[in-house]
Curated annotation (Swiss-Prot):
UniProt cross-references to PROSITE patterns, sorted A to Z: G_ENGA
Gene3D superfamilies: 3.30.300.20, P-loop containing nucleotide triphosphate hydrolases
GO annotation, biological process: ribosome biogenesis
The species this protein was found in: Staphylococcus aureus (strain NCTC 8325 / PS 47)
Domain KH-like as annotated: residue spans: 352-436
Species lineage: Bacteria, Bacillati, Bacillota, Bacilli, Bacillales
Protein name per the record: GTPase Der
Amino acid sequence: MTKPIVAIVGRPNVGKSTIFNRIVGERVSIVEDTPGVTRDRIYSSGEWLTHDFNIIDTGGIEIGDAPFQTQIRAQAEIAIDEADVIIFMVNVREGLTQSDEMVAQILYKSKKPVVLAVNKVDNMEMRTDVYDFYSLGFGEPYPISGSHGLGLGDLLDAVVSHFGEEEEDPYDEDTIRLSIIGRPNVGKSSLVNAILGEDRVIVSNVAGTTRDAIDTEYSYDGQDYVLIDTAGMRKKGKVYESTEKYSVLRALKAIERSNVVLVVIDAEQGIIEQDKRVAGYAHEQGKAVVIVVNKWDTVEKDSKTMKKFEDEVRKEFQFLDYAQIAFVSAKERTRLRTLFPYINEASENHKKRVQSSTLNEVVTDAISMNPTPTDKGRRLNVFYATQVAIEPPTFVVFVNDVELMHFSYKRYLENQIRAAFGFEGTPIHIIARKRN
């Protein structure tokens, strides 16, 4: 199920990042007063009343050295392409500007719902200035103050009123939904072609040349799959096609729709920081993961080469210690059969449930082998544990004091649960909760 996407659009320094942070409830973008300083995360989850949605701060998407007006135009186009509802932000202190009118002209053509937010309305006297923005043609402007959190409720009421009915999932629940992610030119398109056995995706050697892709259904050895091909993250002919953050946005959307994510790395080039960033998105969303080392045919090998490379992967991707590693050559179509058992096992474990009685036996044994920690004379008491969710498997451990559950002991319990039940290919989450 894909959540609606809300994009915040506006010229620099109208307060997009401040509102973004208010809506998602945490400071995930760096905010300064100088135009163009938004960094870090541009995509997060929000909720209002009974509605869950994803939200984009387009100010975080930089278009290289493109001219100022081109940047604003590109950000508006990204919002039009990706969003279900657009929040168009202006700034009451600076009034209506030529840049605001330029963004409005682009948004008129979008045929997407646009909610006009007038920011920095920090007191009642400033509300009369809001009416100047009616001339933009988007109906009632909503006065808000990002710095004080005023007016956000009315703004979000207007935003969620444009959400349609939730779409039914078109695929059977036994169908494994696969997304394929990785930095440009690691061979994502070639891997899709190798799996499908046909040249469905146009492939060239220039990073970022793959056109938009659609879902493709596929069966192998009695199991149905849907490939959500994220190799087509970048749209050709657009000014923003070269921005890494835009391609990340497209990948995040695909990851959200997946059960299992194939993280593709290039055996020839080795592992770089961008690989870890891309893989981190799948981990953060709690998806099952298989690491695919592609272009294995290009590496000179002896009997120890694979083990050495695997050790390197484990060292660089410590947060993915649960993921299995497949070595393949998409171009030569070799070793692809090793992929599917890993995919199937990861998917199965992502949905695995364990009985509470068996789980508590494992936890009790773990505590007897390694007693719970103490802090200032107080010992952590673990009363019982239960599984509360799947995809990913999530366990609640009821304790006397949550503060006494140190990260290291939680990690120890996770390792013991994994040793008992497997869970290869999937993250598991452990939540400490105080017993009432």
